[in-house]
């Protein structure tokens, strides 16, 4: 059996308190001495938080003391915000990494997509658009397309000597002036539509998933972008699997509303009237 006795409190010169308590347990008397220092901590909070703490409680909590009551209040999980000391350095490192990554991406000078300018599938179409926008500007689109590759032996000799050989002049490269290459380009143009008045927020994925999904497999979708800003110019070229599917898409999509704009859909190259 434990019996507690009266306690003694002694104020010390250093500001602490000595609390002496006595306890009798199983016929033995124990003396317990505790030295306590009282520390007053003041917390600075935002004035809006301080004003909310002064709100009067209502309902079942009327006249209740300050603080949450676990019988009527459910507390969420506490989340501690841990700020790093070198957060500024980490932010600069992430910015530098993003810049290096963006500098390494290949960008076409014509349509702004991730491929070389010489391999742009809409080279001839974009040259016509550039000529309409600025008739006095030199067109450099055809400079790579009209050059015929040199002989395989000369390109191999250049490689052996360590000289740079453009891809169009390397062994096995397609001859842009050949009939087969020209026929394949013409077949692509026959099944390619030009979509204008396109919303600037529409990208290739949006067009495939929300606009072109009824027309089966779409080999190529290119949204023309501004070379400086990277924003869409409201123009896109879509190559379909066949000319018949392209004609069906042209009839169904021309004049249709998409993302708050009325689309204008036509052939990328005008068809000859029969």
Curated annotation (Swiss-Prot):
<dbReference type="GO" id="GO:0001732">
    <property type="term" value="P:formation of cytoplasmic translation initiation complex"/>
</dbReference>
<dbReference type="InterPro" id="IPR035979">
    <property type="entry name" value="RBD_domain_sf"/>
</dbReference>
<comment type="similarity">
    <text>Belongs to the eIF-3 subunit G family.</text>
</comment>
<dbReference type="InterPro" id="IPR012677">
    <property type="entry name" value="Nucleotide-bd_a/b_plait_sf"/>
</dbReference>
<dbReference type="GO" id="GO:0005852">
    <property type="term" value="C:eukaryotic translation initiation factor 3 complex"/>
</dbReference>
<keyword id="KW-0648">Protein biosynthesis</keyword>
<comment type="subunit">
    <text>Component of the eukaryotic translation initiation factor 3 (eIF-3) complex.</text>
</comment>
<protein>
    <recommendedName>
        <fullName>Eukaryotic translation initiation factor 3 subunit G</fullName>
    </recommendedName>
</protein>
<keyword id="KW-0597">Phosphoprotein</keyword>
<dbReference type="InterPro" id="IPR034240">
    <property type="entry name" value="eIF3G_RRM"/>
</dbReference>
<dbReference type="Pfam" id="PF12353">
    <property type="entry name" value="eIF3g"/>
</dbReference>
<dbReference type="GO" id="GO:0033290">
    <property type="term" value="C:eukaryotic 48S preinitiation complex"/>
</dbReference>
<feature type="region of interest" description="Disordered">
    <location>
        <begin position="161"/>
        <end position="187"/>
    </location>
</feature>
<keyword id="KW-0396">Initiation factor</keyword>
<dbReference type="GO" id="GO:0006415">
    <property type="term" value="P:translational termination"/>
</dbReference>
<feature type="compositionally biased region" description="Basic and acidic residues">
    <location>
        <begin position="172"/>
        <end position="187"/>
    </location>
</feature>
<keyword id="KW-0694">RNA-binding</keyword>
<dbReference type="GO" id="GO:0003723">
    <property type="term" value="F:RNA binding"/>
</dbReference>
<dbReference type="GO" id="GO:0002188">
    <property type="term" value="P:translation reinitiation"/>
</dbReference>
<comment type="function">
    <text>RNA-binding component of the eukaryotic translation initiation factor 3 (eIF-3) complex, which is involved in protein synthesis of a specialized repertoire of mRNAs and, together with other initiation factors, stimulates binding of mRNA and methionyl-tRNAi to the 40S ribosome. The eIF-3 complex specifically targets and initiates translation of a subset of mRNAs involved in cell proliferation. This subunit can bind 18S rRNA.</text>
</comment>
<dbReference type="GO" id="GO:0016282">
    <property type="term" value="C:eukaryotic 43S preinitiation complex"/>
</dbReference>
<dbReference type="GO" id="GO:0043614">
    <property type="term" value="C:multi-eIF complex"/>
</dbReference>
<feature type="domain" description="RRM">
    <location>
        <begin position="191"/>
        <end position="270"/>
    </location>
</feature>
<dbReference type="GO" id="GO:0003743">
    <property type="term" value="F:translation initiation factor activity"/>
</dbReference>
<dbReference type="InterPro" id="IPR017334">
    <property type="entry name" value="eIF3_g"/>
</dbReference>
<keyword id="KW-0963">Cytoplasm</keyword>
<dbReference type="Pfam" id="PF00076">
    <property type="entry name" value="RRM_1"/>
</dbReference>
<feature type="modified residue" description="Phosphoserine">
    <location>
        <position position="168"/>
    </location>
</feature>
<dbReference type="InterPro" id="IPR024675">
    <property type="entry name" value="eIF3g_N"/>
</dbReference>
<dbReference type="InterPro" id="IPR000504">
    <property type="entry name" value="RRM_dom"/>
</dbReference>
């Amino acid at each position: 059996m434990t019996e507690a006795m009266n306690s003694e409190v002694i104020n010390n010169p250093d500001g602490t308190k000595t609390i002496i308590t006595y306890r009798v347990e199983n016929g033995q008397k124990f003396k317990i001495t505790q030295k306590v220092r009282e520390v007053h901590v003041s917390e600075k909070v935002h004035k809006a938080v301080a004003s909310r703490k002064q709100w009067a409680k209502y309902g079942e909590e009327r006249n209740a003391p300050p603080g949450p009551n676990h019988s009527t209040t459910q507390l969420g999980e506490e989340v501690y915000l841990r700020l790093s000391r070198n957060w500024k350095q980490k932010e600069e490192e992430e910015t530098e990494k993003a810049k290096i990554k963006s500098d390494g991406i290949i960008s076409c000078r014509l349509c702004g997509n991730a491929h070389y300018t010489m391999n742009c599938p809409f080279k001839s179409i974009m040259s016509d658009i550039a000529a309409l926008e600025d008739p006095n500007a030199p067109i450099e689109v055809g400079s790579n397309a009209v050059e015929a590759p040199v002989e395989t032996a000369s390109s191999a000799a250049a490689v052996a000597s360590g000289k740079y050989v453009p891809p169009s002049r390397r062994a096995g490269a397609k001859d842009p002036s050949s009939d087969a290459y020209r026929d394949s380009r013409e077949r692509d143009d026959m099944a390619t539509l030009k979509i204008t008045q396109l919303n600037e927020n529409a990208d290739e994925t949006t067009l495939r998933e929300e606009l072109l999904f009824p027309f089966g497999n779409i080999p190529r979708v290119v949204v023309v972008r501004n070379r400086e800003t990277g924003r869409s110019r409201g123009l896109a070229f879509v190559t379909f699997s066949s000319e018949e599917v392209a004609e069906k898409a042209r009839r169904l999509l021309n004049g249709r509303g998409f993302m708050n704009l009325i689309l204008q859909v036509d052939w990328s190259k005008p068809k000859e009237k029969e």
